[in-house]
Structure formats: C-alpha cells, structure tokens
Amino acid sequence: MLNKELQEKLSDLDIGVEFAEEVSEFLTLTVPKENLHFLMNKLKTDIDLSFDYLFCVTGMDWGQSLGVIYHLESTVHRHNLVVKVQTSDRENPILDSVYDIWQTAEFHELEVYDFFGIKFNNHPKLRRLFLTPEWSGYPLRKDYVDTANMIIK
C-alpha cells in the first residue's frame, strides 16, 4: 500500500491522528496517547494493514514533552509506518504498553523506562534494565544532571 493510501485509511479511523508534513520514505503520524493502544492494535489486526513487525522503539525528550517513536513494518504488504506518541507530564510520564500486541516491545519498553522514565501501563515486568535500581534519574532526558560527570555532552 502506498503512503497516500495508508494515510487515507488511517484518517478514516477518526481518532485524532496527525500526519507529518515532511516527505519521508515512511509515512509518519502522531497519535494522542489515549488512542495509542487502539491504533496499534488496529495496525496489526486490520487485514489491509497487517503491521506484524515492530522493529524499533525509541524514547524521546522533546523538551516540553516525553514520548516514544514506533517503527512498524508489514511483512505481508511490504509497507512501513512511524507512529509517534507523547505526554506533557514529565513528572509521571505514562503511556500504554504495546507488549500485548507485539511481544518484542517488552525489551524496548524496558529500555525507554530505564533511560527516560516513561512508565508503560500493563507491561508484564517494568524495571531497570541497564542501570542499577539505585540509579537516580533518567540519563537520556534533557534535564538530567550528571553529578558524577560520567556523561560528556
């Protein structure tokens, strides 16, 4: 399916998705956090979409908000999609887990939690992955203060 066709089909869902203006190889959209799980489930289960492969999950700090970028591929239809979601709550950032849709999300969500502090509702075992439980803060956030000078900016 071409990006234009994908955009038309996803626009019909009427869940507040916004499409990126810039031209890219992958169609890119932003979804409101309250509609993330619904959209992701639809992307995988709709026979015309069949996004069966979640190949990358990236945490982001956009300054005023924190979020996640998901890269999806349909191995059936050979199309790709980038889905962005964000929350303005920097003190207690919470998004829905997509682990129940793609089990590969388990590791990725642990990494995002560890470095950005974004919690995922319904994750099977959310915990620190690389950093010790005693580690203070989230080192990939823009406001992280490295008191030990271990990170060179």
Kindly label every feature range from the protein language model.
Residues 1-153:
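Terminal low-complexity/charged segments
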